Amino acid sequence: MKISRRTFTQNMAGSLLTFSLLKSLDKVDALANTVSPIVRKWLIEMEHLTQQLRQGQIKSTEWQSQIESLLSRVDLKDLLTAIDFDKLSKTAVFPEDHESAEDVDFSQNKGLPGELSFAPYFYAMKKGTAIVPHGHRNMASMHMMLKGRSHCWQFERVSDEAQYLTIRPTEDKELGVGAVTTVSDHRTNIHWFRALSEPVFMFNIGVFRINPSEAFNGRDCIDPLGGEKLKDGLIRARRIEIKEAYALYGKS
């Protein structure tokens, strides 16, 4: 069973306390009638790749590489038009200790199914706020910088314990406009972003519950800076709730 954007929004809202990121689809009117043929082709390719991922025809690491390649070929102006960037940027909300996210509706584009296999979002952040350190299970996602600068940290998820995750740092870099990052269960599972300018806008897609027979629970938040340093650069990081993650990492 494919989890819908609306179901994911409801689940996240319940499990992440006051995680007021995701708003109703009827508040965003970013429809496909403004999408150019190039971007429409890109959207169709993205949907095809995600269907292949869900059907087990490609691995999650292949999905990551191909999504990154697709985005590198899309003209930024076309992408901004496709998501109705002007409207979304004007109505964006900027919480004090985390990002905000608006749903982007591509469902009326020609050549696409009524319900996509991935969920697209528009993220907004004020300077100093963060997408707190977290990982996922049974999910893949992509973030693309649309405006501003952010710092990105990524980690491999080495092992799980009830109260800890052992992780290996893989990326520690600044991102500018056009930069793309991806995560999955099998490559760079954990990520963390901090806005270096204001505003920061990102395009995001999430592929939730890739394997319908396995659990999906949103975000696994951790405390990497307070973690135990192990040999070979590994960190044993404590699992934390979203409220504590916001307190520790949400604002700097």
State where each predicted segment sits.
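N-terminal secretory signal peptides and thylakoid transit peptides that target proteins
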Residues: M1-L16
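C-terminal segment of N-terminal export signals and the immediately downstream linker at the start
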Residues: L22-T61
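A short glycine-rich, His/Asp/Glu-containing loop-to-beta-strand
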Residues: E99-K127
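Conserved short histidine dyad/triad with adjacent acidic residue
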Residues: Y121-H136, D185-T188
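Glycine- and acidic-residue-biased ligand/ion/polar-headgroup-sensing regions
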Residues: M139-A140, M144-H151
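A short hydrophobic beta-strand segment most commonly corresponding to one strand
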Residues: M142-M144, S197-I210
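Short acidic-glycine-tyrosine-enriched beta hairpin
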Residues: S159, Q163-T188
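Asparagine-centered strand-capping/turn motif at beta-strand->loop junctions
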Residues: W192-A195
